[in-house]
C-alpha cells in the first residue's frame, strides 16, 4: 500500500513540474537610453539551449524561462531586427 501512495505522489510531483506555466523573467531594468537599445533576438528560434526571446527596455535578449510571471516575450515580427535599434 505504501508503495502505491509513493508512486502516486511521485507521479503528481512529476506532472506539476512538467505542466507548470513558464514565463520570461521580469527585467530588473526599468528604462534604457535609445542609443543603448539592442536586440540579441527577435523570436525564440534565435535563442539556444531552451532559452526564450524576452523583451526588456534595453532590447530583446535570450533568457531561460521561469515559473514566476512578470516578464514579457518578444513580439518579433517583420520589423524586428537584431543589433542596435536606433
From Swiss-Prot:
Disulfide bonds: 24-54, 32-58, 41-53, 42-80, 47-62
A GO biological-process term: defense response to bacterium
Cellular localisation: Secreted
Post-translational modification summary for this protein: Contains 5 disulfide bonds.
Keyword terms of this UniProt record: Antibiotic, Antimicrobial, Disulfide bond, Secreted, Signal, Toxin
Gene3D superfamilies in the cross-refs: Elafin-like (4.10.75.10)
Signal peptide: 1-20
GO cellular component terms, A-Z: extracellular region
Keyword Transit peptide in record: no
Keyword Signal: yes
Tissues where this protein is expressed: Expressed by the venom gland.
Domain WAP as annotated: residue spans: 21-66
UniProt GO molecular function: toxin activity
Function according to Swiss-Prot or TrEMBL: Has antibacterial activity.
Protein family according to the UniProt entry: Belongs to the venom protein 11 family. 01 (wap-1) subfamily.
Name of protein: U15-lycotoxin-Ls1c
Amino acid at each position: 500500500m505504501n508503495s502505491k501512495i509513493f508512486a502516486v505522489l511521485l507521479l503528481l510531483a512529476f506532472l506539476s513540474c512538467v505542466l507548470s506555466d513558464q514565463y520570461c523573467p521580469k527585467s530588473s531594468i526599468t528604462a534604457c537610453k535609445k542609443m543603448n537599445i539592442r536586440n540579441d533576438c527577435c523570436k525564440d528560434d534565435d535563442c539556444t539551449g531552451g532559452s526564450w526571446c524576452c523583451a526588456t527596455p534595453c532590447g530583446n535578449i535570450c533568457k531561460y524561462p521561469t515559473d514566476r510571471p512578470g516578464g514579457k516575450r518578444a513580439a518579433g515580427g517583420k520589423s524586428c531586427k537584431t543589433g542596435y535599434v536606433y
